Amino acid sequence: MSASLSDDSLSTHIETMMVEQNPRGMQHLYAKQETGTYLRAAKSLHHAQGTVLIGTGFAVNNTFETDGPVGAIALYKVLEKLGKQPILVTGNPLYSALKNDFNCFELPINSIENARTFSIKALEQLKPDCVLSIERPGLNEHQRYYNMRGIDISEHCGCFDFFITEAPCPTI
């Protein structure tokens, strides 16, 4: 790859590579997305001066999946080196596994009905400059969480959705 690629071109190139061979059909979503997503995300993180909230943890068989938290931890460490204050936002059992080694904020599990109020209060308390989500499920129109097999996993999930939708700062 040429060292003379512009930031925009590099972002588009990386975005394309990430979805080219994705078996989950992400290329169909990417076609509808505005280009430059990765560059905008990088700039949001770069411009954050203080707290960055990193939501992670996807419920799998009464535990958690492992690739999202590893990516979240890697990003946490980079942000820390850059002088930012990252906070991992997750529910149990992942919260308990991470809280002794990282700055963490606990999401209540299976509390969707109180999630918006909880999130707004947490955002006021934590005052983030950026909020991002790595490997988190998202609520559907019925306020439920499902995995890719269509299994309802709501009772095992903490709700991070409103941290994204109610954040007074850039979100990723």
Give residue spans per PLM region:
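Short beta-strand segments
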Residues: 55-56, 133-137, 172
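An acidic, phosphate/nucleotide-engaging active-site surface
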Residues: 98-165
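Conserved acidic residues
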Residues: 50, 129-130, 169
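A short helix->loop->beta-strand "cap" motif at the edges of active sites that frequently abuts
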Residues: 83-84, 167-172
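Short, glycine-rich nucleotide/cofactor-binding loops
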Residues: 29-33, 54, 58-70
